[in-house]
Amino acid sequence: AYWSFDDKKLIFQSNNNNWGVECDQMFIMDFDDTFDKSQPKMVSTGNGRTTCSYFLPDNEHFIYASTHLKDDNCPEAPLRKEGKYVWPIYDSFDIFISDLEGNITGQLTNEKGYDAEATISPHGDKIVFTSTRNGDLDLYTMNIDGSNVKQITFDLGYDGGAFFSPDGSKLIFRSSRPKTEKEIKENKGLLDQGLVQPTNMELYICDSDGKNLRQLTDLGNANWSPVFHPSGKKILFSSNFEAERGFPFNLYMIDLDGKNLTRV
């Protein structure tokens, strides 16, 4: 779930059968809604699968990724491949702008491959997203209208879940970067099948144009969902690096120089 810029609403995805959906769709709520006697308002098309919604600064529109242009039906969501936990990377995902009534007002991507995981700069002028348009899962930026697309990460592996710093000058993201010949072969083999294995990810930080890229964590296991603290001086993230069997995940805070790791 993500806050609106005025902190009054939340937008999130759900496949709650009690709300009449079986495939992830986007819903909006006031921050204090409880849904004891009601259900949240669906603001996506109700077709295909959706992911990664984020409010625009006007609080009247949002972006999200959806597969509905390719197929109204819900695409398969495999959880394991040869015993390994995997995420599907649907090449039918594109990024759209919608109003709060669920009306799509613009399509921002139309390239072959996966386009998703989009978030917006605090200034409301730039979008960062993950795409496979070059054959790998890299980060790109574009203007709020979909123009001026630029690739900003280039190393082999999965770069995703990027967020801007409060001043818009930096990005924090999760990355799974294979290094050995075996890891590279497995990574490419999974991606050829539209899959990625998210069990070994570290956090990386860079300028918003991709410069000054550096690895922030080296903890092992899955370190993900990083966001900047409002001060811009720390990163809050989720990790299972202390877990013996993959669970539980806990929240941690770390300085931008990788020091002072603290479990929250």
Segments from the language model and where they lie:
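Mature N-terminal segment immediately following signal peptide/propeptide cleavage
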Residues: 1-9
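Residue-level detector of Asp-centered blade-edge/turn motifs that repeat once per structural unit
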Residues: 5-6, 57-58, 122-123, 166-167, ...
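A flexible loop/linker signature enriched in serine peptidases of the S9 family
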Residues: 13-26, 44-50, 65-95, 107-115, ...
